[in-house]
Amino acid sequence: MIQIGAIKLNDRLEIIDTFNQLIQPTHYVKLHPRIKRITGISQDQLCDAPQFCEAAQRFHAWCGTDCALLTWGCDDVSVFQQNLDFFAYSEPFPQMYDLQRLYGELTGDTKNRAGLKSAMEHFGIEPDADHPFHNALNDAYYTALVFQKCPQPQDVLRFSQTARKL
C-alpha cells in the first residue's frame, strides 16, 4: 500500500476536504515500474513519505468521529485492513460501505462488478486529465462524484463492508 486518498463530503454531498497521503513501503521498498506507470507515483516521492502507521494516524485524525467511509469495491478495504493488522494499528476506523454494490443494484446488474469508469460514463461524468485514474485521491474523487449522482445515496448504508482475507 503506497497511498491513502479520500474526499470528505458534507450532509449536502458537497466536497469540503481532501486527504492525500503517500506511504513509504517498509517491505517491498523498490517500486515496480508497472506501479509507477499506472499510479504516476515515483520512488523518490515514496522515500520522503511517512511509513504506514503514521499515515494511518493522519488519516484517522482527518476522518474524525462522525463519518462513514465509501469505497468502490471490496479490494481496497481488504488491503487496508491487511496493513492495519500487519502493523498492529489498533485505532478503529469508521464503518466502510461499498458504493460499487449500490451502483450494481441501481443498474440491475448485481452479478458483475462494474468499474468506476463505467459508472462515471453511466452518470455522464467526464474524466479530467488533471485527475488520472489509479491514484488513490483521484479514484476517491471520482467515487464521490458517482455518489453525488446516486438517486438515493443513503441506500449505500445497506452495503457495509468487512475485510476479506487476502
Regions found by a protein language model. Give the residues of each.
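Acidic, Mg2+-coordinating catalytic module of metal-dependent nucleases/exonucleases
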Residues: 68-74, 79-84, 115-166
